[in-house]
Amino acid sequence: MPWIQLKLNTTGSQAEDLSDALVESGAVSVTFQDTHDNPVFEPLPGETLLWGDTDVIGLYDAETDMAEVVAMLEQHPLLGAGFRHKIEQLEDKDWEREWMDNFHPMRFGQRLWICPSWRDVPDPDAVNVMLDPGLAFGTGTHPTTALCLQWLDGLDLAGKTIIDFGCGSGILAIAALKLGAARAIGIDIDPQAIQASRDNAQRNGVSERLELYLPKDQPADLLADVVVANILAGPLRELAPLIGCLPKSGGHLGLSGVLATQAASVAQAYEDKFTLDPVAEREEWCRITGQRK
């Protein structure tokens, strides 16, 4: 069905109040958008950061009388008569099809493809991971996931054990298993990620070789030939004493979820235990890799 969108601009501190006003005026949903498209990379747990210049966008049923909506909003003390806003009609689309059309098979390195289930596999003889976008992070579209997949594709994983620390969708652990690893261990703080990883592993026929744990449940003596952690710079620094002990002597470590500007501080947290490689970059993100001394 078609919709009507009303957009107004405000400050981050007033956005929540105006969101409530839009809901009271009949909006079925309200979203916040940075006016200048500046991303927020790493909010603290439980924190919702808003930009200094924020667009508040309300979505209304197509039958809504928008003149009445505007008149109601003009009574709000933060808006007043003649407040600046933009109203536009959104065309009726098959939104599920529109969403699906944005995802295509993607190649990483020489052997590895990540394919959504509704697409044909481009190369049946390649290493193909079937993965659909879901609640947990990791489909290959983000530069950090792509950097990690390329790295895994370049390793000799035959018969190896891998730990995917912060496994999200399980994409890295599953890719490693499909690339020849004998065993993979996924760890995540989010139970939804554990379930998503389990479902994706079953879809790819590798569930019997994938172990999944919440941090409180993981074995104390975990060691692996390869450890990959695609999380964020802050946790990578804070958890360096833990993550750095997971690779065996001579084992490989791959870290991402790190902005290029954060690479030096993250690398510093691991350089005592690892011989580090040159940093790999993609867009504004990077990957730090090394071998356990």
Swiss-Prot record:
Q: Tell me a GO biological process for this protein.
A: methylation
This protein's name: Ribosomal protein L11 methyltransferase
Q: Which InterPro entries match?
A: Ribosomal_L11_MeTrfase_PrmA, Ribosomal_PrmA_MeTrfase, SAM-dependent_MTases_sf
> Which GO MF terms are attached to this record?
protein-lysine N-methyltransferase activity
CDD domains according to UniProt = AdoMet_MTases (cd02440)
Cellular component GO terms held in the UniProt record = cytosol
Q: Which family does it belong to?
A: Belongs to the methyltransferase superfamily. PrmA family.
Gene encoding this chain?
prmA
